Amino acid sequence: MASTADFKNGLVLVIDGQLWQIVEFQHVKPGKGPAFVRTKLKNVLSGKVVDKTYNAGVKVETATVDRRDTTYLYRDGSDFVFMDSQDYEQHPLPESLVGDAARFLLEGMPVQVAFHNGSPLYIELPVSVEMEVTHTEPGLQGDRSSAGTKPATVETGAEIQVPLFINTGDKLKVDTRDGSYLGRVNA
């Protein structure tokens, strides 16, 4: 059990027998009336996102989630294979469980896999990754960093928006949460 004061992003709650992860939350103390906590919850299995409001201080049931450090090894058909960094056990996870994170998975990448009662729930990528641009249209003479964006394909096949001065072969830093361009990496 946890109080609303213990809420943090990533905490997994048990609501009506289902597991919900806190995506974001906000403590609100209005000038009139009691304080409350506004949350955005994501169903761990279905991916459905809902908004839920709790009165401040309410106790909620939390799930015991074991986060393990793993390394992404390879893709095997529709499964993604991860190796536990402690016992070297391999865990094949289905594409449905990996979800949108597959866009930024590179072989050898360190990834955290969350388990509940021995079953994998979801994966957590590093916040940013370095990737090489495999294709983008060439920039024009006089392009500046703030002049706009263009699509670029990175080595995993994901398409992201990058500034006009980025060329094929450049190494970029990409935010894995939303796929946004963070900067160019000096080689």
UniProtKB/Swiss-Prot annotation:
Keywords: Cytoplasm, Elongation factor, Protein biosynthesis. InterPro entries: Elong-fact-P_C (IPR015365), NA-bd_OB-fold (IPR012340), Rib_uL2_dom2 (IPR014722), Transl_elong_fac_P/YeiP (IPR020599), Transl_elong_KOW-like (IPR013185), Transl_elong_P/YeiP_cen (IPR001059), Transl_elong_P/YeiP_CS (IPR013852), Transl_elongation_fac_P (IPR011768). The keyword Nucleus does not apply. Its main location: cytoplasm. GO terms for cellular component: cytoplasm. Pathway: Protein biosynthesis; polypeptide chain elongation. SUPFAM superfamilies: Nucleic acid-binding proteins, Translation proteins SH3-like domain. Pfam families: EFP, EFP_N, Elong-fact-P_C. GO terms for molecular function: translation elongation factor activity. It is found in: Cytoplasm. PANTHER family: ELONGATION FACTOR P, ELONGATION FACTOR P (EF-P) FAMILY PROTEIN. Involved in peptide bond synthesis. Stimulates efficient translation and peptide-bond synthesis on native or reconstituted 70S ribosomes in vitro. Probably functions indirectly by altering the affinity of the ribosome for aminoacyl-tRNA, thus increasing their reactivity as acceptors for peptidyl transferase. This is Elongation factor P. It comes from Mycolicibacterium paratuberculosis (strain ATCC BAA-968 / K-10). The gene is efp.
